[in-house]
Design a protein with these regions (language model features):
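N-terminal, Lys/Arg-enriched amphipathic/low-complexity engagement segments
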Residues: 2-66
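A generic structural signal for residues embedded in beta-strands
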Residues: 37, 88-91
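A mature extracytoplasmic/lumenal domain signature
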Residues: 41, 93-95
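Intrinsically disordered, low-complexity linker/loop segments enriched in Gly/Pro
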Residues: 72, 95-149
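Short, solvent-exposed loop/turn positions at domain surfaces
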Residues: 22-24, 74-77
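Extracellular beta-rich ligand/substrate-recognition surface
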Residues: 67-71
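Residue-level recognition of short, solvent-exposed, well-ordered loop/turn junctions
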Residues: 30, 81-84
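Conserved beta-strand/loop scaffold segments within soluble protein domains that form the structured core
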Residues: 78-81, 109
Length: 149
């Protein structure tokens, strides 16, 4: 019978900036199980100012999880007990809900999709409205959110 699992983001369940097949699984599940995965995002350099919700575990991760490379904080890995090497796995994303009321955009010279277009480092905090599913840019423009990954 399929089970429901929850994998929280914590200092013992995340790794920062890399993938590695040798990582110990943070969770083991059977095929057909449902997993709710909590995620966090961003280093201390992109935290928002006062008035935003910052999950306490994000600050603990900043203090206690080594940042091996530039990149995202990843929750997991998850081991599928019956999976074999070279098998293709089907993962269905049922729903995505925001945990924070902010996101960020970070631009660095000589990086990203337009490396020659930006000559200064810029960080922008974007207010997120989970109920309206909108992001509000600092100058007031509101954009629809369609989380997909």
């Amino acid at each position: 019978m399929a089970k429901a699992h929850r994998l929280v983001a914590s200092t013992s369940t995340v790794h920062w900036g890399y993938f590695d097949s040798e990582l110990k699984p943070a969770l083991e599940v059977d095929s057909g199980d449902t997993v709710t995965i909590e995620t966090v995002s961003g280093g201390a350099d992109v935290l928002p100012g006062p008035g935003y919700y910052v999950p306490p575990e994000l600050l603990e991760i900043h203090d206690n999880v080594p940042r091996k490379m530039l990149g995202h904080i990843l929750t997991g890995p998850i081991r599928i007990n019956t999976a074999k090497i070279n098998q293709v796995l089907q993962v269905d994303i049922i729903d995505i809900k925001l945990r924070q009321d902010w996101g960020y955009n970070f631009i660095r010279p000589l990086s990203g999709g337009l490396p020659g277009e930006f000559h200064e480092t810029t960080k922008m905090t974007i207010r997120l409205d989970n109920d309206a599913q909108e992001g509000e840019l600092p100058w007031g423009t509101r954009l629809p959110l369609r989380p997909f990954f």
